[in-house]
Design a protein with these regions (language model features):
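N-terminal Rossmann-like NAD(P) cofactor-binding subdomain of oxidoreductases
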Residues: 2-185, 221-222, 278-280, 284-285, ...
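Charged docking surfaces used in two-component/phosphorelay signaling
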Residues: 70, 162-325
Length: 325
């Protein structure tokens, strides 16, 4: 892909919600080279995103003419923008980076977390999937453990912010909107994200199991997840239990986390980062590290709208620019 001009790339962001807004701010913050930035949605309108006013265009095939990178951050499913329009964007020369779940498990589509499997970008055919928010922060922490010690089993419980449900989730917490969650979210914890399948797993739990195996290239990895929505605005937290391939010492684990890409770690095993501290930051924070034999327990938090969505997507584009693939 040799689309860089003297002035940068033409970017399209499909979706003007929370993730779309964070994409604008991350592209600016990370100084991604932009010649033109288009915001597209179902209907034309003027919106303010990241402190800028944008004339939103209609997301339709011709809107992708001349686009180099198209970030999809809108509705998922059969009627979603990516399913309807990703192929149209690709046929016009764009590389599509999709934040939704529609293509993540497609064998022909790389599912990317750059700190973990950037090399998988070599095989893309114009469409790249951004991982689920809760999966992303987990695999950022699992990958260095896998490299150092090997992985046998993972058990994770999540505590996920309402912004993971979009503006509707925020409104449910702040204004009492009652059509977003199956039970009241304010002052509560809901151990159901998505719907429950025949296997007893929720939609979110299944994503974590299947996506982590694909990203880590460990198709047989034993992963057990329980995902919970909590009344926090931004920032997902996870309690993770890992069985590794050999007995380890605490000092070894601290060294691994302290040198791993994408991880923010104070160096103190007893440190306890919280969603409030992670909000607005692009890294994955780790703390409460405990070791017994071949078992490692730890806590991680990350901004679900940044590393869990927008930052990871922009990192993918940066990787493509660097590699020219």
């Amino acid at each position: 892909m040799e689309v860089l001009t003297m002035n940068g790339y033409t970017i399209a962001i499909v979706g003007a919600g929370l993730v779309g807004e964070r994409l604008v701010s991350e592209l600016r913050r990370r100084e991604f080279p932009i010649q033109e930035l288009r915001v597209l949605a179902r209907s034309a309108r003027t919106v303010e995103m990241a402190g800028e006013a944008f004339e939103v265009g209609v997301a339709e095939p011709d809107a992708f003419e001349g686009v180099d990178f198209a970030f999809f951050a809108g509705t998922e499913g059969e009627k979603g923008a990516a399913v309807q329009l990703a192929s149209e964007a690709i046929s016009r020369g764009a590389v599509v980076i999709d934040n939704g779940s529609d293509f993540r498990l497609d064998d022909e589509v790389p599912l990317i977390v750059p700190e973990v499997n950037e090399d998988a970008l070599e095989n893309h055919n114009g469409l790249i999937a951004n991982a689920n928010c809760s999966t992303t922060q987990m695999v950022v922490t699992l990958a260095p453990l896998a490299k150092a010690f090997g992985l046998r089993k993972v058990v994770v419980s999540t505590y996920q912010a309402v912004s993971g449900s979009g503006r509707g989730g925020v409104e449910a917490l702040e204004d009492g909107r009652d059509d977003v969650y199956p039970k009241q979210i304010a002052g509560n914890a809901i151990p159901l994200i998505g719907s429950i399948g025949d296997d007893g797993l929720s939609t979110e739990e299944r994503k974590m199991v299947l996506e982590s195996r694909k990203i880590l290239s460990l198709p047989g990895l034993e992963v057990h997840a329980t995902t919970v929505r909590i009344p926090v605005h931004t920032g997902h937290a996870e309690s993770i239990y890992v069985e590794v391939g050999r007995d380890v010492e605490l000092a070894e684990v601290l060294e691994v986390f302290g040198s791993a890409p994408g991880i923010v770690f104070s160096g103190e095993a007893d440190d306890f980062p919280t969603p409030l501290e992670a909000a607005g930051e692009s890294g994955t924070f780790v703390g409460r590290i405990r070791v017994e034999g071949n078992v490692i327990n730890y806590w991680c938090v990350s901004d679900n709208l940044l590393k869990g969505a927008a930052t990871n997507a922009v990192q993918i584009a940066e990787s493509l620019v660097k590699a020219r693939v």
